[in-house]
Amino acid sequence: MSQQELLKKIIQALDQAEIPYMLTGSIVSSLQGEPRSTHDIDVLIAMQKTKAHILLEAFAPSEFYWDKESILEAVDRRGMFNLIDLKEGGKIDFWLLTDDPFDRSRFSRRYKEKLLGLEMQVSSPEDTILVKLRWAKLSGGSEKQFTDALRVYEVQRGKLDMEYLELWATTLAVAPLWRKLLNEAEIA
């Protein structure tokens, strides 16, 4: 199954199970910034334990690897679980929505984007930038994550809520990376 087919399958399964979601990560930064290849799909979901079986029904064990116990545990601890396409190796990382103020804020700011003939809920460009900066910091300065954030900023410049970005860059302790991004964008 191609990544596009996998993405369609995920969105249809989430919509059918009525699980609120938001696409995030490199697939969204490629949409909002500069396209780059990525092997996984990141999805933030607001799923209750009772919905897990409905979601899993869409992913046959003969085609996808998943562990029901790990999934239920991830729902309990508001962590993450993944599904792996056994044929193509595509990976879907499902991140459970937490009570973290930034998680709640970015989830409330998601918007609909038409892609592959489907309407999908995606992260706002501001939140994509902030998450990429946070991952850059957590990974010890990942240039790939920083560059993704920079490219989203460059493409979306003039349409971004700069006050929101400043507030959360400070709150998330990524203000130095945010300033570096602004400096590099000015030079370009």
Where are these regions (language model features)?
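Compositionally biased terminal segments of proteins
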Residues: 1-188
